[in-house]
Amino acid sequence: MRKHVLLAGFIGLLATSLEAGAFEEYKQQQAAGVKKEGKNFVQHKAAEEAAFKKYQEDINRAYSDYKKEVSLYWEEPRMSTKKEWVSYAKDKKTRTAVDFEAETITIETLAKSAKDAVSMLQVSLAKVVTETVAQAEKADALIQNIAKIDAESNAVEPKKPNNDPLLSSTVFAKVPTMEMVKKYVGDKVNKKSVVSSRSKINDVKVYSVTVKLPRNSMQKRSKVYMSEVQKNAKRWDLPMPLIFAIMHTESNFNPMAKSHIPAYGLMQLVPWSGGQDSYNFVYKKKRKPSASYLYDAQNNIELGSAYLHLQYYKYMKKIKNPTSRLYCTIAAYNTGAGNVAYAWLGNYNIYKATDKINMMTPDEVYDHLIAHLKYDEARHYLKKVNKKMDQYHKLYGDI
């Protein structure tokens, strides 16, 4: 029998108390809940789906336009992903890439001489290790373009700027002084550490430096969110290791995470589906959160945890065994409750699928999901989260 990494402590906690699809997945999720009928409902859903499609097209257009703009300067126009945050200077001639999975900072600049390059690279490194999330958002032209699209669609905006540090709590043991930053930058960026390569622009080269983040950076970043995770684990009757495992798997604790869907932030919420569902559940208002709202860690953890609560206590509530229900909840967070049902029935009705699920042991449910989930990503996702739950249980305990 498989050794359960879902330990008894947080199974007991659960017993007592997406986001991978885009437009098609959004429609499936709408069909996964309680059945609703009537012409007005159908018309309303059609209007919602049309609005989501337009939003996605507008976001994709903004992304494509920005990519074309930076490609004028760079052979490879790198863009932000779930695990890597990429930002460009206003003139697009310097860029910074923080890889939260590889735990590196890579800065590149276009310059005529190594001397000029070293100076620019030092300034850029000092900036990225000291700036806040709000400052990073303000300096990112693509994020600002997306903010305009959100404003046009009446998305919920954050009430105040997010002044959480982006990297300083990972890089420095305490709030850094100017002297600490200057020493750090001087140690990391110098003529010996900077390398050059060919540029697509005449008379300049690409100068770059790669800086490794400190050891245990992942653990340090997770600790930054400890109080919010504890608060929401208690509020939504969830095991704390589950929330940490989802955050780690979704973004590697990158608060600026963005996927192509698009999904945003630490727990990778899609504004028009999981984001809207959870916001409506928490605040009783059917509105979608903006990208900026979801880049705020407090907001993201609240809504992401609420979305897990919805999956476990609403969509999966008829699954009797808490471990089986948890496996299905993890899969549903990534691929939607409808696709979990599809693994058993070939249709998207999760309530009907529970009859078959309840006939299986937790091990059998896990094996069935791994074998029959519609998408490979969801299968790998379940494995990763399951493994990381054990990791965070050992690190922090249940609550």
Predicted regions, residues:
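Short, functionally critical alpha-helical segments immediately adjacent to catalytic or ligand/cofactor-binding
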Residues: 230, 237-258, 269-270, 304-305, ...
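Bacterial N-terminal signal peptides
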Residues: 8-15
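Short, solvent-exposed loop/turn and secondary-structure capping segments
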Residues: 256-259, 279, 342-346
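Substrate-binding/active-site groove segments that recognize
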Residues: 260-287, 299-310, 358-360, 385
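Bacterial N-terminal signal peptides that target proteins for export
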Residues: 1-7
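Active-site metal-coordination segments of metallo-dependent hydrolases
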Residues: 217-220, 291-301, 376-377
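Cell-wall glycan-active module
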Residues: 19-245, 313, 319, 346-399
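Catalytic and binding regions of secreted/periplasmic enzymes and modules that target cell-wall glycans
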Residues: 300-349
